[in-house]
Regions:
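Short, surface-exposed loop/helix-turn segments at secondary-structure junctions
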Residues: 94-102, 132-135
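Conserved phosphate-donor/acceptor-positioning beta-strand/loop module used by diverse small-molecule
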Residues: 78-83, 101-103, 110-128
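PAPS-dependent sulfotransferase catalytic domain
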Residues: 98-111, 140-152
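Hydrophobic "anchor" residues on beta-strands that sit immediately upstream
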Residues: 75, 117, 156
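Glycine-rich phosphate-binding P-loop
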Residues: 1
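Hydrophobic residues at beta-strand termini and immediately following loops
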Residues: 11, 120, 159
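NTP-dependent small-molecule kinase module
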Residues: 125-178
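ATP-dependent small-molecule kinase phosphotransfer cores
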Residues: 4-8, 12-94, 98-99
Length: 178
């Protein structure tokens, strides 16, 4: 059901580049949740409690899944690793990219140190076209801004994700295997 906030959306027209009921529902759901999260996470006690439980959950899930590889001294390649937890929660909390970066630094001791960070830069518009479960462009724009800030501030290796898959794959392999 489309929320009242989006009641004027016509179901058979494109919404943010996608067509139909599904995208209208995703937008409505995002708007509803964003409003609720904004109210809940304004309270610093709620933010702290939420982040504590999210970190504990992520910490145990991560270590259960990777401990055997770490103990065996194997190389591990992660997709977003623990950083995405901080990016998502930072968006929920309304934090600036700088504040998110500081939160990552504060809790990095909980996770293994990475040898390299490879940032595959893809515009929000391209991401939106590639996936059909993205809530809306606002969400992608926020994530993009944060990852751009993190990549520049931490001197990550950046690969242009707008290129054909084979070229992106080749560049990542070169970075990781060299």
């Amino acid at each position: 059901k489309v929320s009242d906030k989006n009641k004027n959306i016509k179901m058979n027209v494109q919404v943010d580049g996608k067509c139909g009921v599904k995208q209208a529902e995703l937008n409505a759901d995002y708007n509803t949740k964003a409003g609720l999260k904004g109210k809940i996470f304004r309270n610093p006690i709620m933010r702290g409690t939420w982040m504590f439980f999210a970190l504990v959950d992520y910490f145990f899930q991560f270590h259960i899944k990777t401990l055997s590889f770490i103990l065996a001294g194997k190389n591990i390649i992660f997709d977003r690793f623990y950083l995405d937890l901080f990016v998502d929660q930072g968006i929920n909390f309304g934090f600036s990219p700088d504040r998110i970066s500081k939160e990552i630094q504060k809790y990095r001791f909980l996770f293994p140190r990475m040898d390299n960070y490879v940032y595959i830069r893809v515009s929000p518009e391209t991401c939106y076209k590639r996936k059909n479960d993205i809530p809306n462009m606002d969400y992608l724009n926020k994530r993009y801004e944060i990852y751009e800030f993190l990549a520049k501030g931490n001197k990550w290796i950046t690969v242009d994700g707008e290129q054909p898959f084979e070229k992106v794959n080749s560049q990542i392999k070169k970075v990781v295997l060299d």
